[in-house]
């Protein structure tokens, strides 16, 4: 596939800093692994939440040129693989990244539904890898360094982001150009990591893998088991009192990375619960300190 011609894919454009400059269709032709491969229907959106994504997109937030660092991050909002918390976790984070000189791309990925995706297990991963591909192939236009492209995810979106970081060679993405799909860094915020019975967020697992996945499938999508010495550096943050996604998800991922000599930083807050970013506005400050060192 030739690099995407963004001039054919731009939905709308603004020039104001902090506002999205473009919304881009992930696929210029048929959507792979879709029950509606030619459909371009908009997703259902209400109250900042997104449902029923048939046509996945990237929403682009670029920093002012005099602040641009060359770094970029693809953001995967959470929502238990049932909805996408698009505004609260996607757009809000993207604006902050742009203010700090980092290009941000909010991913509206396909939510795993049997009615919309042929093999729903890999649908979100295909979309996230395609997003990395698009950012790298169009890096020059956006002032991005191809060697500074990361992935970020919240909650179930953290599972998706960690899947990209550990399974970037494990999903069917049309990549005739040989574009590097490995992210250069990963940022995981109260992430779902494991699909194992003892640790998983059951609703996220059921929505992604179905009600009764076999052991091989559970192991394949337990991203702590997919870590190698080539896994990209990671920043994780979680609250110890998270009652929805056990903090041990972040801890086990941290330990696996550490034992593979992968640079990793973990911030655990004693209180905050799940979704603590909505109650602690300064949560990104240590993240920016970390990312500035990359």
Segments from the language model and where they lie:
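C-terminal catalytic histidine-bearing segment of alpha/beta-hydrolase fold enzymes
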Residues: 247-294
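Primarily recognizes the serine-hydrolase "nucleophile elbow" in alpha/beta-hydrolase
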Residues: 130-200, 218-219, 223
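Short beta-strand element of the alpha/beta-hydrolase
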Residues: 69-78
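Short beta-strand/loop motif that positions the catalytic acidic residue
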Residues: 235-238, 242
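N-terminal cap/lid segment of alpha/beta-hydrolase-fold proteins
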Residues: 21-67
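Bacterial Sec-dependent N-terminal signal peptides
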Residues: 1-23, 294
């Amino acid at each position: 596939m030739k690099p995407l011609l963004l001039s054919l894919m731009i939905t709308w454009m603004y020039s104001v800093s902090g506002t999205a400059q473009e919304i881009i269709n992930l696929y210029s032709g048929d959507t792979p692994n879709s029950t509606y491969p030619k459909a371009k229907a908009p997703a259902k959106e209400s109250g900042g939440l997104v449902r029923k994504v048939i046509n996945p997109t990237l929403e682009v937030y670029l920093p002012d040129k005099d602040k641009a660092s060359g770094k970029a991050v693809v953001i995967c909002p959470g929502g238990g693989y049932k909805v996408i918390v698009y505004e609260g976790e996607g757009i809000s984070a993207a604006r902050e990244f742009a203010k700090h000189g980092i290009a941000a791309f909010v991913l509206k990925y396909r939510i795993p539904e049997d009615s919309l995706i042929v093999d729903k297990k890999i649908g979100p991963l295909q979309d996230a890898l395609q997003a990395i591909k698009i950012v790298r192939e169009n890096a020059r236009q956006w002032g991005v360094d191809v060697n500074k492209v990361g992935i970020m995810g919240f909650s179930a979106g953290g599972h998706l982001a960690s899947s990209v970081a550990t399974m970037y060679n494990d999903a069917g993405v049309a990549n005739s150009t040989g574009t590097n799909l490995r992210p250069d860094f990963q940022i995981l915020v109260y992430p779902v990591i494991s699909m194992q019975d003892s640790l998983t967020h059951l609703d996220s697992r059921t929505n992604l893998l179905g009600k009764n996945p076999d052991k091989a499938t559970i192991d394949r999508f337990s991203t702590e088991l997919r870590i190698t010495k080539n896994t990209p550096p990671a920043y994780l943050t979680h609250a110890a009192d998270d009652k929805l996604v056990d903090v041990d998800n972040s801890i086990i991922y941290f330990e696996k990375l550490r034992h593979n000599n992968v640079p990793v930083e973990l911030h655990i807050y004693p209180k905050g619960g799940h979704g603590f970013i909505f109650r602690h506005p300064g949560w990104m400050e240590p993240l920016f300190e970390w990312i500035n060192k990359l």
